Amino acid sequence: MAAHTIFTTTSTTNSFLFPIASSNTNSAPSLSSSFHGVSLKVKSKTPQSLTLSSVTSPKPFIVFAATKKAVAVLKGTSNVEGVVTLTQDDDGPTTVKVRITGLAPGLHGFHLHEFGDTTNGCMSTGPHFNPNGLTHGAPGDEVRHAGDLGNIEANASGVAEATLVDNQIPLSGPNSVVGRALVVHELEDDLGKGGHELSLTTGNAGGRLACGVVGLTPI
Protein backbone atom coordinates (compact mmCIF):
# COMPACT_ATOMS: atom_id res chain seq x y z
CA MET A 1 0.00 0.00 0.00
CA ALA A 2 1.42 3.33 -0.99
CA ALA A 3 2.27 5.62 1.88
CA HIS A 4 -0.04 8.56 2.32
CA THR A 5 1.57 11.97 2.71
CA ILE A 6 0.75 14.32 5.52
CA PHE A 7 2.11 17.87 5.40
CA THR A 8 3.69 19.41 8.48
CA THR A 9 5.86 22.49 8.81
CA THR A 10 9.51 23.01 9.64
CA SER A 11 11.72 26.02 9.83
CA THR A 12 14.10 27.11 7.07
CA THR A 13 16.06 30.27 6.71
CA ASN A 14 15.65 33.07 4.15
CA SER A 15 17.85 36.14 3.88
CA PHE A 16 16.62 39.67 3.25
CA LEU A 17 18.73 42.78 2.65
CA PHE A 18 17.98 46.03 4.37
CA PRO A 19 19.64 49.20 3.05
CA ILE A 20 21.78 51.35 5.29
CA ALA A 21 23.03 54.82 4.59
CA SER A 22 26.49 55.16 3.05
CA SER A 23 28.89 57.76 4.31
CA ASN A 24 30.61 57.93 0.94
CA THR A 25 28.36 59.65 -1.60
CA ASN A 26 30.97 59.27 -4.34
CA SER A 27 31.16 55.45 -4.11
CA ALA A 28 30.11 53.55 -7.22
CA PRO A 29 26.96 51.43 -6.86
CA SER A 30 27.39 47.68 -6.36
CA LEU A 31 26.90 45.63 -9.51
CA SER A 32 25.13 42.83 -7.58
CA SER A 33 22.38 44.91 -5.99
CA SER A 34 20.98 48.40 -5.86
CA PHE A 35 21.22 48.15 -2.08
CA HIS A 36 24.07 47.48 0.21
CA GLY A 37 24.01 46.87 3.89
CA VAL A 38 23.65 44.10 6.46
CA SER A 39 21.69 40.89 6.01
CA LEU A 40 19.03 39.68 8.43
CA LYS A 41 17.98 36.05 8.65
CA VAL A 42 14.21 35.47 9.05
CA LYS A 43 12.62 32.07 9.64
CA SER A 44 9.76 31.02 7.35
CA LYS A 45 7.77 27.77 7.11
CA THR A 46 7.79 25.35 4.22
CA PRO A 47 6.05 21.96 4.05
CA GLN A 48 7.84 18.74 4.85
CA SER A 49 6.40 15.32 4.10
CA LEU A 50 5.69 12.73 6.80
CA THR A 51 4.51 9.23 6.09
CA LEU A 52 1.32 7.91 7.69
CA SER A 53 3.24 5.12 9.38
CA SER A 54 4.83 7.63 11.74
CA VAL A 55 1.43 8.81 12.99
CA THR A 56 -0.25 6.87 15.79
CA SER A 57 -3.31 5.10 14.34
CA PRO A 58 -6.52 5.00 16.39
CA LYS A 59 -7.46 1.64 17.88
CA PRO A 60 -10.27 -0.16 16.01
CA PHE A 61 -13.77 -0.03 17.51
CA ILE A 62 -14.84 -3.55 18.43
CA VAL A 63 -18.48 -4.58 18.94
CA PHE A 64 -19.06 -7.66 21.05
CA ALA A 65 -22.07 -9.92 20.54
CA ALA A 66 -24.55 -9.63 23.41
CA THR A 67 -26.40 -12.63 24.78
CA LYS A 68 -29.82 -11.94 26.25
CA LYS A 69 -31.84 -14.26 28.44
CA ALA A 70 -35.40 -14.20 29.75
CA VAL A 71 -37.69 -16.45 31.77
CA ALA A 72 -41.41 -16.99 32.24
CA VAL A 73 -42.95 -18.89 35.15
CA LEU A 74 -46.29 -20.35 34.06
CA LYS A 75 -49.16 -20.79 36.49
CA GLY A 76 -52.92 -21.10 36.18
CA THR A 77 -56.06 -22.05 38.05
CA SER A 78 -55.36 -25.78 37.69
CA ASN A 79 -52.30 -27.77 38.67
CA VAL A 80 -50.60 -26.94 35.37
CA GLU A 81 -47.34 -25.06 35.86
CA GLY A 82 -43.97 -24.70 34.26
CA VAL A 83 -40.84 -22.71 33.49
CA VAL A 84 -39.80 -21.42 30.08
CA THR A 85 -36.38 -19.91 29.36
CA LEU A 86 -35.57 -17.84 26.28
CA THR A 87 -32.03 -17.13 25.07
CA GLN A 88 -30.87 -15.00 22.15
CA ASP A 89 -27.31 -14.41 20.92
CA ASP A 90 -26.88 -10.96 19.38
CA ASP A 91 -29.52 -10.63 16.62
CA GLY A 92 -29.89 -14.37 15.97
CA PRO A 93 -32.95 -16.54 16.56
CA THR A 94 -34.32 -17.10 20.04
CA THR A 95 -34.03 -20.52 21.65
CA VAL A 96 -36.99 -21.45 23.87
CA LYS A 97 -36.70 -24.27 26.40
CA VAL A 98 -40.02 -25.45 27.83
CA ARG A 99 -40.88 -27.65 30.78
CA ILE A 100 -44.52 -27.81 31.86
CA THR A 101 -46.15 -30.30 34.21
CA GLY A 102 -49.74 -31.23 35.10
CA LEU A 103 -50.98 -31.49 31.50
CA ALA A 104 -53.22 -34.13 30.00
CA PRO A 105 -51.15 -36.43 27.77
CA GLY A 106 -51.03 -35.29 24.16
CA LEU A 107 -50.56 -32.10 22.16
CA HIS A 108 -51.22 -28.62 23.53
CA GLY A 109 -51.11 -25.29 21.73
CA PHE A 110 -48.30 -23.04 22.94
CA HIS A 111 -48.31 -19.37 22.07
CA LEU A 112 -46.87 -15.99 22.91
CA HIS A 113 -49.68 -13.52 23.66
CA GLU A 114 -49.57 -9.78 23.21
CA PHE A 115 -49.88 -8.51 26.78
CA GLY A 116 -48.12 -9.33 30.02
CA ASP A 117 -51.33 -8.54 31.92
CA THR A 118 -52.47 -11.34 34.23
CA THR A 119 -54.83 -9.30 36.41
CA ASN A 120 -57.70 -11.45 35.12
CA GLY A 121 -55.65 -14.61 34.88
CA CYS A 122 -54.56 -15.78 31.46
CA MET A 123 -57.61 -14.25 29.78
CA SER A 124 -56.19 -10.72 30.09
CA THR A 125 -53.04 -11.56 28.14
CA GLY A 126 -54.88 -10.66 24.94
CA PRO A 127 -54.58 -12.29 21.49
CA HIS A 128 -51.51 -13.90 19.97
CA PHE A 129 -48.59 -11.52 19.49
CA ASN A 130 -49.06 -10.42 15.87
CA PRO A 131 -47.06 -7.26 14.96
CA ASN A 132 -47.37 -7.96 11.21
CA GLY A 133 -51.16 -8.31 11.19
CA LEU A 134 -51.21 -11.81 9.63
CA THR A 135 -53.46 -14.82 10.16
CA HIS A 136 -52.69 -17.77 12.43
CA GLY A 137 -50.39 -20.51 11.16
CA ALA A 138 -47.64 -22.97 11.98
CA PRO A 139 -44.21 -21.83 13.22
CA GLY A 140 -42.65 -22.70 9.87
CA ASP A 141 -45.27 -20.92 7.76
CA GLU A 142 -44.55 -17.67 5.99
CA VAL A 143 -47.99 -16.39 7.03
CA ARG A 144 -48.32 -16.68 10.81
CA HIS A 145 -48.52 -14.71 14.01
CA ALA A 146 -45.11 -14.02 15.53
CA GLY A 147 -46.48 -15.68 18.66
CA ASP A 148 -47.46 -18.92 16.91
CA LEU A 149 -45.12 -21.46 18.51
CA GLY A 150 -47.07 -24.57 17.52
CA ASN A 151 -47.68 -27.45 19.91
CA ILE A 152 -45.87 -29.06 22.79
CA GLU A 153 -46.52 -32.70 23.68
CA ALA A 154 -47.09 -34.01 27.18
CA ASN A 155 -46.10 -37.58 27.98
CA ALA A 156 -48.11 -40.10 29.95
CA SER A 157 -47.03 -38.39 33.18
CA GLY A 158 -48.36 -35.03 31.98
CA VAL A 159 -44.89 -33.53 31.47
CA ALA A 160 -44.07 -31.60 28.31
CA GLU A 161 -40.45 -30.79 27.52
CA ALA A 162 -39.40 -29.11 24.30
CA THR A 163 -36.77 -26.88 22.73
CA LEU A 164 -37.95 -24.44 20.07
CA VAL A 165 -35.91 -22.08 17.89
CA ASP A 166 -37.72 -19.11 16.37
CA ASN A 167 -36.58 -15.88 14.69
CA GLN A 168 -39.79 -13.89 15.25
CA ILE A 169 -39.63 -13.57 19.02
CA PRO A 170 -36.55 -11.39 19.76
CA LEU A 171 -35.62 -10.28 23.27
CA SER A 172 -34.85 -6.71 22.19
CA GLY A 173 -35.86 -4.19 19.55
CA PRO A 174 -39.29 -2.89 18.51
CA ASN A 175 -40.83 -6.39 18.44
CA SER A 176 -39.30 -7.58 21.69
CA VAL A 177 -41.30 -10.24 23.50
CA VAL A 178 -40.12 -9.09 26.92
CA GLY A 179 -43.16 -8.08 28.96
CA ARG A 180 -45.52 -10.28 26.95
CA ALA A 181 -46.99 -13.61 28.07
CA LEU A 182 -46.50 -17.26 27.15
CA VAL A 183 -49.65 -19.39 27.32
CA VAL A 184 -50.20 -23.15 27.18
CA HIS A 185 -53.63 -24.23 25.93
CA GLU A 186 -56.04 -27.03 26.65
CA LEU A 187 -56.19 -28.51 23.14
CA GLU A 188 -54.00 -29.15 20.12
CA ASP A 189 -53.37 -26.17 17.85
CA ASP A 190 -54.63 -26.98 14.32
CA LEU A 191 -52.01 -24.54 12.93
CA GLY A 192 -54.62 -22.62 10.95
CA LYS A 193 -55.53 -25.60 8.80
CA GLY A 194 -58.44 -27.15 10.68
CA GLY A 195 -61.25 -25.37 8.86
CA HIS A 196 -62.79 -24.23 12.16
CA GLU A 197 -64.03 -20.67 12.52
CA LEU A 198 -61.23 -20.09 15.05
CA SER A 199 -58.50 -21.79 13.02
CA LEU A 200 -57.13 -18.56 11.55
CA THR A 201 -57.13 -16.67 14.86
CA THR A 202 -56.33 -19.11 17.67
CA GLY A 203 -55.77 -22.44 15.95
CA ASN A 204 -58.86 -23.62 17.86
CA ALA A 205 -56.56 -24.56 20.74
CA GLY A 206 -59.18 -24.24 23.46
CA GLY A 207 -58.88 -22.73 26.92
CA ARG A 208 -55.82 -21.19 28.53
CA LEU A 209 -54.43 -23.51 31.19
CA ALA A 210 -51.42 -21.56 32.44
CA CYS A 211 -49.47 -18.44 31.55
CA GLY A 212 -46.43 -16.42 32.56
CA VAL A 213 -44.92 -13.04 31.77
CA VAL A 214 -41.56 -12.99 29.96
CA GLY A 215 -38.97 -11.09 31.99
CA LEU A 216 -35.25 -10.49 31.48
CA THR A 217 -32.89 -12.39 33.73
CA PRO A 218 -29.10 -12.34 34.33
CA ILE A 219 -27.06 -14.47 31.93
Swiss-Prot record:
GO terms for cellular component: chloroplast. Cu cation binds at residues 111, 113, 128, 185. Its EC number is 1.15.1.1. The keyword Oxidoreductase applies. Residues 1-65 form a transit peptide. Homotetramer. This is Superoxide dismutase [Cu-Zn], chloroplastic. It comes from Petunia hybrida (Petunia). The lineage of its organism: Eukaryota, Viridiplantae, Streptophyta, Embryophyta, Tracheophyta.
